Amino acid sequence: MQTPVPTDNPRVKPIAHDGAPWFARQSVETALLAGAMALPLAGLLHAESAPERGLIGLKYLDYLDSQPGEPRIQVRAKALLLMTPISSDWSIGGTLTSDAISGASPSYQSSALTRMHDERHAAEGDLTRYFPNGTLTLGASLSSEADYLSRGVSAQATRSSESKNTTWSAGIGFNSDSINPTNGVVRNERKKVTTTLVGLTQVLTPRDIVQINLGHSSGKGYFSDPYKFADERPRDKTGNTLTLRWNHHMQTTEGSARMGYRFYRDNWGIAAHTVDLAYVQPLAQGWTVTPLIRLYSQSAADFYVPAAQSSYPFAPFTTGPYSEDQRVSAFGARTFGIKVAKQIGPDWLLDLKFEQYGQRAAWRMFGAGSPDLAPFNARSVQLGMSRPF
């Protein structure tokens, strides 16, 4: 289980508000460790006995986004993961992450690029107790950079039926963030977010597993982006998620189809849909190939100011919240990717993953996108290696 880390740090410059590709929506620490949710399940089925061997892994991420004629943000990140059993009933895990972010980000809408550079260092740890029919995991995290400090704690429990075909899960996480932007727009701002998750995983057949998760988040404090012109967001934010997953094993090819859907809605007026499709195909000599597709769509926040109504270089003439940030506009996005993995000998596993992301107002589903948004593209390359010990 990954402990929650900040997802609203403006220096990360995520593409979308929620449900966008993992490499853009979350902070880089989470991206490298595949933490797509604040309280993710460790898998569709949670092991109920401590692993017999430990695991060590390295990850490297190179991410670059761009708009027409202008490269924007580049992220290069490294992570070290370690997990080891400490008895037949206990295991501990930890992750150290370091990343460098550089490039330019729009000050408003998708124009007026401003240069930026930042480095981040993060550490996460968790302790798991295994019971005959369940687990309990406690976690903590710390993420630090020049203008942002985040501290988090979390707890997650699972409980399985006697047949092991049904697993219930519940988790809670708390994050406390301190924000001190280098431009001095605000000083000593705070943000606190609590996230809860309940889930059910069910084995339907020897080849089918389904899962449903319900999530809720509630936060208060500073959610604005101090590096953007005309950005004054509400100081409270609540959101709910519904996540559905289905894994199906193909008997004829020995491959597995993985399908997922996620719905998100918050009190800012944003409603988002995410559809994930992936197919894992084992090949000869230890090779595995996984093509993937992700479709995303969101509505605009109630306080989003479209480009046509922008009063730049003056703030919008309104007494309420406002933002010209395209991340809270209405748009659609498409991600295409492929992952190739190679088992080397009995222990070493190498993997290489490539994803290409595109964002357009015209791609929004269930309604029109926000007008005058520039096309946005991003690509990420992730290299990993791991082995048990």
Model-derived segments and spans:
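Cleavable N-terminal export/targeting peptides
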Residues: M1-E52
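Residues on the lipid-exposed face of transmembrane beta-strands in outer-membrane beta-barrel proteins
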Residues: L80-T84, G125-R129, A155-R159, V198-Q202, ...
